[in-house]
Design a protein with these regions (language model features):
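Short, Lys/Arg-enriched N-terminal segments with co-localized hydrophobic residues
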Residues: 1-8
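Conserved N-terminal phosphate-binding loop of PLP-dependent enzymes in the Aspartate aminotransferase
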Residues: 10-472
Length: 472
């Protein structure tokens, strides 16, 4: 009877034992950004279900998700309304394309809703399946824009070292991450300037002076290349995958001044910062940026369906529409099911005042506790905007020194302690980062901070025991 009950429970749970799942995963599933041979030996942690800010794995551990999946589950997991929207749309119109002078109701309604919530004159949307695809769209769009205006030589896009704009050939080229460039190279016509990372690179300068210095690299690069050759500048309001690098207050106003002075297009990559993450609907509002094009994805559907897009200002859209076909698009541009889910997601964000919750409740509550982490012997800096934050790990707070070990060694150890303590935090080099679902409550923030502190304590004890609290 006990054996029968065990089999029945396993059937209800709807999965094989974890070890068997791990073996199947290792045999057939190639994971992104992963050493798959190392993972095969270790075995993946396998998630089974989720609700709100909580994940449950196949071993029954209840894990608080400090990263909202990959920065995307803004309204939290398990919202039945989004499942219902997907099911209803699948029954009514499961798929149709938006090529060949054809449209459908979900794409029309979503484009109009995005125009409603987007700032300024960002009133037009070109849909894609992801943020990476949307940034590939942006490369072609800005080059086509200048071509139509009779300046086809304006083809170069300027981006930033350690920026992230996806991992397609186009998006990966825009991003300034050497590890991505090493696997397949870059496409032509993209150059990079420095990032506004004061903690690691600011030396003895004030953050404000360093912000100006980094921003003015854009002007230097424009003049070096020739303004007649430069199409656009792209940047994330806050570098996400680069380590939640919140720029000094002087940085974005100076960038805006420079793009305005030289008349180049400004692309704000809001894949992470969009849809409430910074306490406003868009990070551009938080930092006073006025982009011509805005990249969106992730929080657009809270990750419930893959969808992205480029929100385009009136002037760029008018030019793009004045010269015949734009020979670009994707099978899943404006996919009706994804669009219906995104529309329902935005309804929930609006009607449940989730953006206001971030600004007025969650951020102020987390801010005080996040800053207090700088009292920990391992933490040199704690930064937070809205509900995305980072802490810098250092062996010497006074000098902001790096560890003698290879960059990322300490961060990885800390991340593993977080995982062991049922907290998902990510490490970027030796920075620990968070980006929890926007619906996180003060009580859940207390749990997140308690588990983060325990993990830092354990990491610090291990580093001391192994003689690793040494400066480079």
């Amino acid at each position: 009877a006990r054996q029968h009950k065990g089999r029945a429970m396993n059937k209800i749970a709807n999965h094989m034992p974890t070890a068997e799942l791990q073996a199947l995963d290792a045999a057939h599933h190639m994971h992104p950004f992963t050493d798959n041979s190392a993972l095969a030996k270790k075995g993946a942690r396998i998630m089974k279900s989720a609700k709100g800010v909580w994940l449950t794995d196949t071993e029954g551990h209840r894990i608080i998700d400090g990263m909202a999946g990959l920065w995307c589950v803004n309204i939290g997991y398990g919202r039945k309304e989004l499942a219902a929207a997907a099911a209803a749309q699948m029954e009514e119109l499961s798929y149709y394309n938006t090529f060949f002078q054809t449209s459908h109701i979900p794409a029309i309604a979503l484009a109009a809703k995005i125009a409603e919530v987007a700032p300024g004159d960002l009133n037009h949307v070109f849909f894609a399946g992801s943020g990476s695809e949307a940034n590939d769209t942006n490369i072609r769009m800005v080059r086509r824009y200048w071509d139509i205006k009779g300046q086809p030589e304006k083809r170069i896009l300027i981006a930033r070292t350690n920026g992230y704009h996806g991992s397609t050939m186009g998006g990966g080229s825009l991003g300034g991450m050497s590890g991505i460039h090493a696997h397949g190279g870059k496409i032509a016509g993209i150059v990079h300037i420095g990032e506004p990372n004061w903690w690691e690179q600011g030396g003895d300068m004030t953050p404000e002076d360093f912000g100006l210095l980094r921003a003015r690299e854009l002007e230097t690069m424009i003049l070096q290349l020739g303004v007649e050759n430069v199409a656009a500048f792209i940047g994330e309001p806050v570098q996400g995958a680069g380590g939640v690098i919140i720029p000094p207050s002087t940085y974005w106003p100076e960038i805006q001044r420079i793009v305005d002075k030289y008349g180049i297009l400004l692309i704000a990559d809001e894949v992470i910062t969009g849809f409430g993450r910074t306490g406003n609907w868009f990070g551009s509002e938080t930092f006073g940026i006025k982009p011509h094009i805005m990249t969106i994805a992730k929080g657009l559907s809270s990750g419930y369906q893959p969808i992205g897009g480029s929100i385009v200002c009136d002037e760029v859209a008018e030019v793009m529409g004045s010269a015949g076909d734009f020979n670009h698009g994707y099978t899943y541009s404006g996919h009706p099911v994804a669009a219906a889910v995104a529309l329902e997601n935005i309804r929930i964000l609006q009607e449940e005042h989730i953006v206001e919750h971030v600004r007025d409740v969650a951020h102020p509550y987390l801010w005080a506790k996040w800053q207090a982490l700088t009292d920990h012997p391992l933490v040199g800096e704690a930064k937070l905007v809205g509900l995305m934050g980072s802490i810098a790990l250092t062996p010497n707070k006074a000098t902001r020194a790096k560890f003698a070990s290879d960059t990322g060694t300490v961060g990885y150890r800390c991340r593993e302690r977080c995982f062991a303590n049922d907290l998902i935090m990510r490490h970027v080099g030796d920075r620990m980062i968070i980006s929890p679902p926007l619906v996180i409550t003060p009580d859940e923030i207390d749990i997140l901070i308690a588990r983060a502190t325990k993990s830092l304590d354990e990491c610090y004890a291990g580093l001391k025991a192994d003689g690793m609290m040494k400066s480079a």
